[in-house]
Structure formats: C-alpha cells, structure tokens
C-alpha cells in the first residue's frame, strides 16, 4: 500500500483537484476528462511502473492538478449549488491542503475522505487499494454511470455522516475550525464539480482509463520487448566481434531467429554474417567449438535451409562480385591461416563441403557454402578486420574460418551441411593446431595469432636468437605467405582444396554448430582475421622491405650502419619503430652491442616472445637496446655507437625516419668532439663521431609523416648549427625556439634552433629526436649515437647537446645546445625542452658534457612513452619506457618517467640533462646543471623549494605561459627551450611547465656554463621548489615538480599532471603519468602517491632506475634504487632494488642511497624484479609493468598499463611501444613487441583498407 499511500497522497492533491476539474468537467468537460485520464494513468503506472516512475507520474499529475486548481476555482465558483456540498469537501480539501502541509497526520485519511467525497461509494468500495481505485475508478465510475449519480447522493449521505447535518453548515463550521473559508471555497468547487462530473465522466474515465492502461501495458511491454530485440541484434553485432553471439543467437532463438533476421537482413547481411563468424571463432576456441558442434548441429540443419537459399543466392551474387578481390586477400590469409589448420584437419573440414568444392573454384564454390562464405567474407571482411584488429581476442583460427563461415552459416552449412561435421572438423583443426591460440597458422592471422605468433616467434627467437628474429619471423611469414598464397589461390579458386576451403567450410559448419547456438562465434573474427592476418604479414613484409630498402639506400649513403638501421626500421611498428634495430647484424654501430641490441629489437618486434629471448627483450626495449648491449655507449641514447657513429647516426636518422611511421627525425647533431663530458663512452663516441654526426646530419633529414621535421644537419663543423634538426616539433606545437640559427629544419618545427646558441659546438649536438614511431619515439641519437633505441628515441647525445626527440612530436628539441629548444646556456644547452610531442623529451644537456644530457637527451621520446634518457654512461637508465611513454631515462641517474617523464640525469654533471619527455602526455626534460646547478633540476630532490608549482599550474616560474611558453615550444607543454641564453625558460607551461600535460623542464644548464640556462631552468622548474602537490617533495602534485612534468613533463619542469618529479599522482620525480623519476642523486623526491622519487604516476612510469611505479611510477634514483612507489596502475618494476608498488606508493623517497623501497600500492604491484606480468605480461608487473632490467637499467621501465615485459637486458627499459620490455598497450598485458607489432600492423592494415 505504500504506492497506495503515495497515491492517496497524490490523491489528496489530485482528487480534490480532480473534483475541481470535475466541476470544471461540466464547465469544461475536456479538462476534467484529461485530469481523470491522468489519474487513471497514474493508477496504472503505480501498478505497472516502479516506484520511481510512479513518483514521476505523480509529480506530473500533481503539477497538472495544481495548475487545474489555480484555474478551476474561478470556473468552480459559479457552481454555487454544489459548493455547499463541496463545503463538506472544502474542509476536507482544506484539510487536504493542510494535510499537504502536514500529510503525516491526515494525508491518507483525508485523501480517502476527499476521494470519497469525490467518488464517494466507489471509493469507499475501492478504498482498500488506492492505486486500484485510481485504475478502477475510471472503469467503475464510467461503468456505473447512473449509479455514480446515485452514489453522489450516497456520497452526500456519507458526507453528511461526517458533516451532512447541514451540508452547507458543516462546510462553514468545519471550514472555520479546519481551514479558513478562503481555502474551502476553492476546494468546494472541486468537490462539487466532482459530483457533477462523475455522471459525465464515467465514459471518459472508462475510455481513457481503459485505453491508457492498455497503452501503458502494451507500450511498456512493447518497448521492453523492442528493447531486447534491439539489444539482441546489437549484441549479435557485438558478438560477431566477440564471439558471444551464440548466446544471443539462443536468445534470438538460435539459428532460425538469428538466421531469419539475417535473411531479412540480407541488406545487413554482412552484419549478420559477422555475428556468426565470431561465434565460430569462439567455437574455434577448443571447447566451445566442440560443445557447440554437438549441441548446435541439429538446429543448424533446420535454420540453414531458408537462409541458405535466399541468403545464399544473394550472398553468392555479392560474393561473386567481390570474390576476385577477396579471394586474393583470402588466398594469402587462408593460405597462411588455413595452411596449418588445413594440414591439421584439412580432410575433415571439407568433408561436408568437398562435393561443393569439387564443383569448382570459388565460383563452383558457389554451392552455398563456398560462394556465400566468400561473399559474406567480402561483405563483412572489412568490418571483421576492423573488429578483429580491435578485438585481438578473436582466435586466429576463427580468422581463417570467419571468411568461410559467414556464408556457410547462412547457406551451405545451414542448408546442406550438418553442423556437426563443420564443428568437429573445425574442432579437429583447432585440436591439431592445439587451440586457436596455439595453432601456428592461425597465430599469424588471428588473435590467437598473438599467442601463436608468440609461439612461432619464440621458436624463431630460439632458432635465431642472435639473428634478427624479425627477419626470421618475416622470412617464415614470407615463406608461409608464398606457400599459403598459392594454396589460398587454389582454395579460393577451387575450394576443392580440402585445406583452405574445407576449413572455411568447416568454419561454415561451425555456423551449423552455431545453430547449436555458437554459430556466431567464428565468422567475423575469421573474416577480419583472414584479411588482417594477410595484411599483417604481407603489409609488414612489404612495409619492412620498403623501409629496409629506403633505409638501406639512405643508410648506404649515410654509412654502413644503415644496414642495421634498416632492420630497425623494419620493425616498423606502427607506432614505433625501433630505429635502432637494424636488420642486419652489421655492427656498423657498435657492432657487438648494437647487433645484439638490434637483433633483440627485431626479436622484440617480431617475436612477441621477448621473454624467451632475453636479447629480444633487451633489444626490444629500445633503451634496452643500447643500454644493454653497450652500456657504455649509452646506446640508449642513441645507441650511439662508436662506430662511425657519425655514419650511424645519419643512417640511423635516415633509417629511422623511414622507420618511424610518424617518422622521427633525427637531427643530426654535430657534436664536435667536445662533447667530452658526455659519458666517456659518449664522449669517445661523440668525439669520434662529431664528424660523423655532422655527416649524418644531412641524412636525417627526412621528415616524417607527421611532420617530423627533418633536420638538416648543419654543417658538421659548426656544432652549434648542427642542431638543426629540431625534431619533430610536437605536433601540437611547438615552436621550437629556434633560437639562433636553428636552421629550421624543414621539418615542422624547427626546433632546432640550432642550438646555435649553444656555445659549445659540442653541445650542438642536436639530436633530433626522432619522431620515431608514432607512439613511440625514438630519440634521435644525438649526434653520434645512432638512435638506437627501439622506441626510444634516443637521443643521442652526442654531446650533451643532444636533444632528444620527442616522441610525438617529437620534438625533441632539445638540442643539445640549447638548440632545440631551449638551449640553455650553450653548454648547458639544456636544450631540452622537450617538445610536446606527446612527449617529447628533451633533453638538455648541460654543459657538462656529460650531461648526461646526452644521455638523457637521449631520448625520451616516446610517444606515449618517453624514451629513455640516456645518461651518459649510464645508459641504463634508459630504460623504462612507458608505454605511454615514459622516457626512460637516463642513464644513470635518470630515470624516466613513465608517462613521460623525463628523467634527469643523474650524474651530477650529467645531471642536467635528463630530459625526460613526456612522451605520453608530456614531456619534460630536465636538465640539470651539471651537477648541481640543476638543481634541482631534477633532482628531485632538489628541493626544494619553494613552491611547488601548482599542479596544474605552471611550474616553474618561468613566466612563460605554458603554451606560449616562450620558448617552449612544446605544444602541450612548452618546452623550455630557451635560447641558451635565455634565462627564462618560459617554461611555464601551462601545466606547468612546459608540457602541457607535462612539461618539460627547462634544463638547467650546468650552472656555470649556463647560468642563464640554469636560471631558466630554474624558473622553470627549478625552482626547486618543486614540491609535488601530492606530495612529493620535490614536486608538485600535479606535478609540478619542476622537474617533473605533468603528464610527462620533464622533470625539470613540472609536469602538468605530474611533476616531474612528482608524479601526477605522485611520482616523485617522475612526472605525472609517467613519472620519471628522478634523478639520481638526490634522489628522493617524493612522489605523490609516493613513490619515491620517481615514481611516475600513472600510466606507467618507468622507473628510474630503481623503482618503478606502477602507474607510473618509477622511480628511480639511481643510486638508491629508490623505490618509488608506483602508483598507479601498473607498477613498473622497480629497479633493482627498489621495488615499487604499483599503486602504492611508497614511498618515497629515498635518498639516493636509500633504497627505500616503496611500498606497493595496490593496484598491482610488481615486484621489482619479478617480472610477473599482470596481465600476462612478461615480466611485466601487473599492469604491465615491466621490470626493469637489472642493472641499473633496472629502471627499466615499466609500463603501466601494459605489461611490459621485463626489460630485456639491463636496463633497457622498455621500449615504448615496441619496446621490448614493455609495451604499453593498454589492454595488453605485456605484449611482446612482436605481438604489439602485429596489432599495430593490423590497425594499420585496417586503416589502409
């Protein structure tokens, strides 16, 4: 009765109101009827609709009633004769009004009495259920028509009972005590009206009430029914992708319902078909298929006939039209996928269809199964491909089947073939394959493809761990393609071929099984996959070849190293390419180190199984690349290799650009030998290379898609000029500052200001960051170094100057010499300035040659992730990458942040540079002065001071607004980039420093050398102040640590979200999403959430060396492993010591030395070392973190979401996308780069199509 009570409450208002309107009813029958209808509807709603709906209706009714009352009194007054009677009610109505004020006391009784007054007996009879009264009122009142009038007198008697004695008198009597007459008169008209109305109302009430009730009932049920129906089709479509359809089909009434809709939907046939294929895919998944085959076989035979005929005919026609195209695609895909499956169970799959197949080539295939299959494939293949690529979950097996199944589901299977055969056959295939995922053929083409691919790749890795796995995998793929292509052609041409067509048919048979309710599983995935797999393999091969050729040509021109580079490009991931991995072992870069790295990169790219191949993991991570192999080189930086580094870089540039999809550019830098400071290795390399760098400079040039700019090299001689290349500027923005000459590179931005400013020629190094893969960037190696890192950009620094390129934008701006963006003082060059890119990293170098800057510069970039920074010697840092990008950071000290982060370098000298870049969102870089000055630059520590920026706020003082950032070009964040001289970094990016999201920091230069830069930086971030808001010491919460950048801000600057140091959530140093970490020495910074320093926040950070954080955590101080806690989702691993936790937090900081590990948070933690992947990543920690490699490298990054794997070696952290270690992929657990590449390839393919 609560509804009844509610109704009664409503009744108080409405019924008196109704009565009023009833009075009106006579005056105005329409309004009264409307009111009555409304009441009846309300009653129905009370019964039919949930309380919420009832309340809504009541409110509507009440509003209408009040509106009516406001009008009614006027009309009602004329009815004086009834007013007396109504006066009875008036008190009641007045009561009702009063009761409304104090409904608790009178509401229900008054409502009833008022209702009684209005309806009298009917109500008294119906009083029990007020809602019932409302509903029944209309019917009873209407039906009893005459009785109601009688009832009215009775009602009067009843009224008299309460106040009948003088009907008129009681009204006055009762009104004065109960309510003032003024109220009563209006109420009376309602009551009075109600009496009159009832006689007239009965019919209206009956009609409206009856009508509304059926309407409500009908409409509601109809709507509900409709909704489910809609949902079913929708689910089916979804299922088509997911393979859930079978249930939907069941809901939709299995085959018939589903098929019939398909038949009716022939227009939408692709959709329908798609639905079936996904189910098959699932059915392909071993168990479901088997079960389905048995369960669905009988139903499948039923539904297929009608569908098969009509749908088959239409499908056949369409398919015949599309066959030529699809068959070609299918030939490849089927050959690859079905090849193995066929071999597994070629005969069984065809048994049902073979006769049809025997009829002829695909055309003869026309028998319902074949042609329809293709037709469906042709229709839905594109969609399927898209869906499949999106939902990698589809089993590759299904991919092969999917193309065949859809038509078969409609036609051949449904019409002529028993579902059991198809299912069992599919089954067999799967069984032999070992499960959709494991089947080798399927692995390529379908989701299972990933696991299968991993298996194959693992095999490849094992077979040729030293040789580039990519090449092997590709070769195997090529062989498969060659083998499969003919078979596919045969199959598509004549499905008589038991292998391909049979399997498809089997797939179709799955459709019959689908009738069993799982028919839906296979189709879409298969369709999508068949094309996708083919595209992946063929496109990859073609693109890789093309890249290789381009790279080879360029690299040949540039140098021997090119050969290696091309391979690097080879892997072109969609997002990233490792610039580094060269296909050929040729060392031209540091041969030994490079080769292994390159190989490992290839392996990473190719074989998902990084874990199996440590090299691959190491290589995979770009950072890993260089660092692991040649720690000294800082390969991370660019892999710089000594080798003719000059050449290498150029090749690398050349090669890279091609590689990167987006393209990165490397700017060549020239560092004169001066580099010195760079880590010795760097120095040596740089020294050797400077010339080389200059040479490369021309090479780089190429710009990339996105605009990367290419840089032009300046004359090698003039180091400053060299800077050239600014790298890509960030897409969004970045202007780079070009500062002095910066020749603008043709590339979009110029960044490079050529670092002219930098005083040292050395610094000039400019590296351009490359843009590197879309998502990931590579840093260009600065001058010398070849950009090795896979993803990372490395920057190279040759000298400090290097800039790194940002990922996205690469901008890397920093050139060393200020160049890129900022420069800081010449020596400092902090260049850093990350570009926005998504992240850029910048790096600045400090004057110190070491600067790590170089290293740092190295790269950062990741798209999302930054590359690592390299440290000079430290290469290790590199490591982590975040997927989203973290830059890795830097060598030693530095760590990278995840999201972006920059990292700083640790070395004192080095200190400065780090640049982390945001990579993902922002980058930063930090620079530092040499050691100190930087103060803080990064350091995290640093303190201090003062303020911390506001989180979002900008950081640093620099006045510049962020965007405008004076210099800063970065789009999002500015980088600081100032001319070297410029003091102010202008950083202030909006978010704070530079980066928008993250900022970069300005680098500080070495203090001496560039006080200005330092100064700049300082403001930018330096200000030491960086505290994180959340907490970190240094940084500001959102990061503003100076250093850190928000999302990615570089360390120095605060990041928007995360300060550099701090992380968004807190990483200490690291930047928001990614935190970087920070730096070395001091180390600690706190993290927001706490990670120690480093932790990056979010998404992933890398760790600095040490810890990682999950989300972003990382940590990292070098020395200590700081733990950093990770925050977020994923933890990165921490470096060695530290552990970080994912969410966790921990802590904080530790000083350098301390390890402090952080505690883990919750989300997932990974342990440091451990690699367990959360999602499966390899080592990856939960979300993917990966662990770092041991060694300093540890820092390796982790990825937040994705898993990454552990880095392969050493440090290397991870590569952003492809990187080995970790890859980002949000969803993915750790994926091996190989898997990632496949996904990317699919995506690309889908896009292309």
Swiss-Prot record:
GO terms for cellular component: endoplasmic reticulum membrane; nuclear envelope; nuclear membrane; nuclear pore; nucleoplasm. It is found in: Nucleus, Nuclear pore complex; Nucleus membrane; Endoplasmic reticulum membrane. The modification Phosphoserine is found at residues 94, 345, 351, 371, 393, 396. Residues 168-190 have a biased composition (Pro residues). GO terms for biological process: mRNA transport; nucleocytoplasmic transport; protein import into nucleus; RNA export from nucleus. Essential component of the nuclear pore complex (NPC). The repeat-containing domain may be involved in anchoring components of the pore complex to the pore membrane. When overexpressed in cells induces the formation of cytoplasmic annulate lamellae (AL). This is Nuclear envelope pore membrane protein POM 121. It comes from Homo sapiens. The gene is POM121.
């Amino acid at each position: 009765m609560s509804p009844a009570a509610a109704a009664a409450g409503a009744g108080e208002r409405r019924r008196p109101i109704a009565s009023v309107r009833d009075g009106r009813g006579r005056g105005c029958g329409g309004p009264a009827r409307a009111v009555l209808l409304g009441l009846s509807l309300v009653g129905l709603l009370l019964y039919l609709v949930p309380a919420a709906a009832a309340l809504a209706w009541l409110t509507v009714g009440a509003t209408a009633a009040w509106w009516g009352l406001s009008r009614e009194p006027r009309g009602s007054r004329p009815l004086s004769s009834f007013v007396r009677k109504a006066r009875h009610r008036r008190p009641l109505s007045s009561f009702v009004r009063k009761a409304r004020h104090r409904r608790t006391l009178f509401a229900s009784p008054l409502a009833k009495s008022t209702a009684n007054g209005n309806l009298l007996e009917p109500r008294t009879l119906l009083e029990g259920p007020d809602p019932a009264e409302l509903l029944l009122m209309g019917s009873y009142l209407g039906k009893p028509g005459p009785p109601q009038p009688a009832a009215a007198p009775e009602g009067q008697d009843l009224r008299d009972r309460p106040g009948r004695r003088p009907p008129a008198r009681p009204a006055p009597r009762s009104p004065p005590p109960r309510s003032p007459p003024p109220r009563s008169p209006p109420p009376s008209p309602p009551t009075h009206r109600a009496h009159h109305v009832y006689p007239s109302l009965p019919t209206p009430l009956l009609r409206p009430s009856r009508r509304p009730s059926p309407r409500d009932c009908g409409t509601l049920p109809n709507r509900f029914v409709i909704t489910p129906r809609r949902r079913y089709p929708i689910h089916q479509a979804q299922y088509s992708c997911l393979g859930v359809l079978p249930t939907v089909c069941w809901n939709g009434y299995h085959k018939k319902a589903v098929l019939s809709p398909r038949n009716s939907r022939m227009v939408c046939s692709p959709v329908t078909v798609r639905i079936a294929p996904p189910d098959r895919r699932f059915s392909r998944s071993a168990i479901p298929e088997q079960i389905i085959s048995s369960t669905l076989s009988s139903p499948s035979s039923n539904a297929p006939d009608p569908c098969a005929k009509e749908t088959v005919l239409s499908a056949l026609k369409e398919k015949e039209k599309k066959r030529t195209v699809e068959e070609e695609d299918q030939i490849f895909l089927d050959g690859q996928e079905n090849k193995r499956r066929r071999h597994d169970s070629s005969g069984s799959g065809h048994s049902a269809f073979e006769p049809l197949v025997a009829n002829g080539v695909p055309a003869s295939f026309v028998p319902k199964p074949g042609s329809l299959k293709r037709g469906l494939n042709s229709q839905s293949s594109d969609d399927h491909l898209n869906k499949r690529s999106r939902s990698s979950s589809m089993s590759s097996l299904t991919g092969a089947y999917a193309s065949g199944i859809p038509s078969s589901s409609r036609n051949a299977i449904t019409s002529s073939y028993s579902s059991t055969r198809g299912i069992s056959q599919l089954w067999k295939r799967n069984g032999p394959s070992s499960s959709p995922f494991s089947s080798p053929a399927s692995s390529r083409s379908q989701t299972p493809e990933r696991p299968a691919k991993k298996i194959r790749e693992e095999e490849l890795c094992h077979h040729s761990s030293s040789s580039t796995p990519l090449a092997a995998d590709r070769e195997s793929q090529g062989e498969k393609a060659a083998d499969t292509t003919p078979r596919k052609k045969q199959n598509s041409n004549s499905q008589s071929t038991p292998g391909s067509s049979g399997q498809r048919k089997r797939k179709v048979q799955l459709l019959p099984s689908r009738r069993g309710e799982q028919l839906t599983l296979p189709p879409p995935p298969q369709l999508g996959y068949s094309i996708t797999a083919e595209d992946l393999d063929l496109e990859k091969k073609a693109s890789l070849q093309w890249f290789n050729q381009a790279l080879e040509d360029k690299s040949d021109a540039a140098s021997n190293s090119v050969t290696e580079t091309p391979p690097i490009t080879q892997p072109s991931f969609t997002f990233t390419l490792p610039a580094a991995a060269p296909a050929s072992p040729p060392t031209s870069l540091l041969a030994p180190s490079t080769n292994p790295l390159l190989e490992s990169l290839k392996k990473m790219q190719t074989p998902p199984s990084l874990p199996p191949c440590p090299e691959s993991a190491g290589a995979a991570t770009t950072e890993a690349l260089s660092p692991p192999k040649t720690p000294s080189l800082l390969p991370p930086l660019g892999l710089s290799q000594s080798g003719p580094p000059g050449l290498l870089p150029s090749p690398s540039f050349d090669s890279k650009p091609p590689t990167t999809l987006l393209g990165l550019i490397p700017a060549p830098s020239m560092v004169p030998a001066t580099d010195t400071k760079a880590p010795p290795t760097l120095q040596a390399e740089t020294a050797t290379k400077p010339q080389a760098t200059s040479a490369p400079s021309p090479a780089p040039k190429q710009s990339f898609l996105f605009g990367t700019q290419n840089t032009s090299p300046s004359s090698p001689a003039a180091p400053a000029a060299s800077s050239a290349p600014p790298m890509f500027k960030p897409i969004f923005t970045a202007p780079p500052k070009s500062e002095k000459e910066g020749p603008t590179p043709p590339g979009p931005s110029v960044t490079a200001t050529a670092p002219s400013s930098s005083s040292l020629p050395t610094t000039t190094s400019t590296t351009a960051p490359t843009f590197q893969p879309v998502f990931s960037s590579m840093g260009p190696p600065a001058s010398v170094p070849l950009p090795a890192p896979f993803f990372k950009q490395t920057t190279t620094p040759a000298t400090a100057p290097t800039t790194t390129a940002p990922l996205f934008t690469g901008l890397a701006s920093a050139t060393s010499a200020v160049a890129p963006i900022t420069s800081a003082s010449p020596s400092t060059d902090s260049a850093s300035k990350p570009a926005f890119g998504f992240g850029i990293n910048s790096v600045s170098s400090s004057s110190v040659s070491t600067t790590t800057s170089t290293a740092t510069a190295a790269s950062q970039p990741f798209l999302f992730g930054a590359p690592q920074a390299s440290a000079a010697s430290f290469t290790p840092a590199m490591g982590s990458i975040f997927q989203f990008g973290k830059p890795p950071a830097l060598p030693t000290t530095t760590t990278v942040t995840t999201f972006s982060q920059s990292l700083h370098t640790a070395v004192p000298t080095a200190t400065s540079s780090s640049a982390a870049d945001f990579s993902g969102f922002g980058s930063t870089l930090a620079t530092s002065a040499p050691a100190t000055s930087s103060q803080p630059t990064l350091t995290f520590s640093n303190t201090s001071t003062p303020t911390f920026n506001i989180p979002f706020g900008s950081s640093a003082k620099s006045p510049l607004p962020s965007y405008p950032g004076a210099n800063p070009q970065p789009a999002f964040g500015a980088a600081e980039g100032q001319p070297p001289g410029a003091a102010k970094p202008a950083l202030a990016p909006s978010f704070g420093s530079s980066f928008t999201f993250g900022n970069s920091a300005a680098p500080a230069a070495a203090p001496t050398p560039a006080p200005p830069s330092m100064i700049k930086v300082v403001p930018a971030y330096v200000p030491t102040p960086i505290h994180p808001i959340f907490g970190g010491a240094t940084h500001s919460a959102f990061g503003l640590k100076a250093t850190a950048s928000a999302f990615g801000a570089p360390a120095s600057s605060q990041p928007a979200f995360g300060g550099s140091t701090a992380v968004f959530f807190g990483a200490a140093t690291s930047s928001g999403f990614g935190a970087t970490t920070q730096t070395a020495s001091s180390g600690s910074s706190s993290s927001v959430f706490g990670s120690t320093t480093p932790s990056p926040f979010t998404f992933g950070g890398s760790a600095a060396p040490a810890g990682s954080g999950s989300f972003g955590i990382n940590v990292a101080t070098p020395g200590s492993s700081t733990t950093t806690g990770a925050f977020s989702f994923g933890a990165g691993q921490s470096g060695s010591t530290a552990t970080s936790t994912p969410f966790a937090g921990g802590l904080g900081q530790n000083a350098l030395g301390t390890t402090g590990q952080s505690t883990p948070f919750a989300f997932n933690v990974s342990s440091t070392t451990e690699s367990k992947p959360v999602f499966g990543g390899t080592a990856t920690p939960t979300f993917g973190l990966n662990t770092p490699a041991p060694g300093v490298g540890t820092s390796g990054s982790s990825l937040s979401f994705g898993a990454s794997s552990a880095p392969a070696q050493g440090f290397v952290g991870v590569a952003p996308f492809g990187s080995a270690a970790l890859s980002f992929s949000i969803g993915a657990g750790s994926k091996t780069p190989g898997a990632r590449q496949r996904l990317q390839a699919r995506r690309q393919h889908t896009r292309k199509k």
